[in-house]
Amino acid sequence: MDNSKIKVVVGISGGVDSSVAALLLKQQGYDVVGIFMKNWDETDDDGVCTAEEDYKDAVAVANEIGIDYYSINFEKEYYDRVFTYFLDEYKKGRTPNPDIMCNKEIKFKAFLDFAMKLGADYVATGHYARIERGDDGVKLLRGLDNNKDQTYFLSQLTQEQIKNVMFPVGELQKKEVREIAKKYNLATADKKDSTGICFIGERNFNEFLSHYLPAKQGNIVDVDGNIMGKHNGLMYHTIGQRRGLGIGGDGAAWFVCGKNLATNELIVCQGEDNPLLYSNKLYASQFETSLNHLDRNEFDCTAKFRYRQKDIKAHVKFIDDTHVEVTYDDTKAVTPGQAAVFYDGEVCIGSAIIDEVYNGDKKLMV
């Protein structure tokens, strides 16, 4: 098949995954163009702008592969659509996942729109996921590398957003991606994977957050209201957290099991098997699916409530088009603001953002 007339615009980040994605597409004969997205104006603790370093690596790879490349600045879109959302969620005492919103609003909206204006037939990224095309549209499938599968972060995408997408490394193991990069002497072959939230990088999370949200010290209390210590800000803590509480004493360890925004209290309970840490029902909003056909009344599935969590059997019941009730086996530390992501075997059905968490009919203090 002659792919030379098919234009694929690849998001090249300066990392090994997108580098190999671009290489594979070039080898398959596509007309490949690389685009580097600058989403955040950042400097690390040593005064080095990591985006500049990434751009240099992206340019080096584009030249090695022999593809044209451009740089596009999405800082304003990112700030307005992702970072503002991130801060708003923390203000509400929730724990958001900005990577999901970045994919939904930037990589597969702003970038996708830009690529299509360039005349792209497809866009591609270095995500570990797969696309299956059939008579009933396009389906989003888990990446074959179970440890690297990134469908959790792609779960808010719609059919419209994924129908012209390719994930060239989704069929590969991470080890194979590194081997390909080394075989072809790509500049990013030995570059370590980026970790953490893109706009924070390797920096201290609490310190970063304090620049944008005023931290307010308050009491750490047990479930009976007894004061156990002090916290430096509710936003620095998440459900199920054990470390950094500064509570000693005898007996089992203490865990965060709730937040009271009205009184600025962090609520803790004792013991890692404490029932207050476990839930079996949640309510979620902003439901999205990439499937063309889905039972909008209810369906059985498996679910993940955080990245790399094992699949849990679940039942999803629609309240309306965007709100769902999800029931599941007892699960620890299910957290408002995170995504509940739904699967049917290898197929990622979609996701919704967790609002309220229950154990039976009892609403947990989160």
UniProtKB/Swiss-Prot annotation:
Its EC number is 2.8.1.13. It catalyses: S-sulfanyl-L-cysteinyl-[protein] + uridine(34) in tRNA + AH2 + ATP = 2-thiouridine(34) in tRNA + L-cysteinyl-[protein] + A + AMP + diphosphate + H(+). It is found in: Cytoplasm. Keywords: ATP-binding, Cytoplasm, Disulfide bond, Nucleotide-binding, RNA-binding, Transferase, tRNA processing, tRNA-binding. It comes from the Bacteria. Disulfide bonds join 102-198. Residues 148-150, 306-307 are annotated as: Interaction with tRNA. InterPro entries: MnmA-like (IPR004506), MnmA-like_C (IPR046885), MnmA-like_central (IPR046884), MnmA-like_central_sf (IPR023382), Rossmann-like_a/b/a_fold (IPR014729). The keyword Cytoplasm applies. PANTHER family: MITOCHONDRIAL TRNA-SPECIFIC 2-THIOURIDYLASE 1, TRNA 5-METHYLAMINOMETHYL-2-THIOURIDYLATE -METHYLTRANSFERASE. This is tRNA-specific 2-thiouridylase MnmA.
